[in-house]
Amino acid sequence: ELTYSEIDYANTSISGQIYDIIRICHVKGGLAIACGDAGIGKTKAIRKYASDYSTNTVVVTMNPCLTGVKSLLCTLAGRLGADRSHSIPDLWNAIVSKLTDGMVIIFDEAQHMTLKDIEILRSFSDYFNDMGQTLGIVFIGNPETVYKMGVKKAEFAQIANRTKQIKIYSTSEIQREDIEKLFPILEGHDKEIDLLWKIAKTHQGIRGTVN
């Protein structure tokens, strides 16, 4: 009898690509955007990366309550252990004092962010770039992330030009091999693997196969 236990991390095709995007941004600095349908392994990639590079990776998970520049900066300051001063300029300076060359900040659920948020965060990366240092900032969320940021608008062009990568993924890109990696216990059980692959390519994504 087969008994399934969830794997902590499987290097699936999409999750692996998102991991690589984070890595490139970490090494080169600047901004990167990776977004896609729910349940394709985005958060799994973030957790794996943060575990592998725990000393210089900061993860911030956004939500609808964290609206406005001050809320964003207060949240980031809290993650960095910086003083949450009352004014935005003081917050900015407090955050800079905690950031160091060679760090990467990953924003999960980035669809809750605005173009203004991105501009403020880019200023941190620019600050380090001007000193010949690197600070990578990665935005990860659903496809709305790109559209809400205004990727088709002229005012986004400057940010897009400064962005290392912008990638959008969908459940339709999930590979059969991904299911085999997630369910090694099903080796040789082609019918079951094909069924799970079919589920994974729906709106449920990979998450739908393990829940």
Q: Could you tell me what each predicted segment is?
A:
Residues 200-211:
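The conserved phosphate-sensing helix
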Residues 68-86:
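Conserved NTP-binding/hydrolysis module of P-loop NTPases
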Residues 55-57, 152-172:
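A short helix-turn-beta junction within AAA+ P-loop NTPase domains corresponding to the substrate/partner-engaging
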Residues 1-29:
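A short, basic N-terminal segment
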Residues 36-38, 113, 128-155:
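Sensor-1/coupling segment of RecA-like P-loop NTPase cores
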Residues 168-195:
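Conserved small helical "lid"/interfacial subdomain of P-loop NTPases
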Residues 95-121, 125-128:
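Conserved P-loop NTPase "ATPase switch" module shared by AAA+ and STAND
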Residues 27-48, 64-65:
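Walker A/P-loop nucleotide-binding motif
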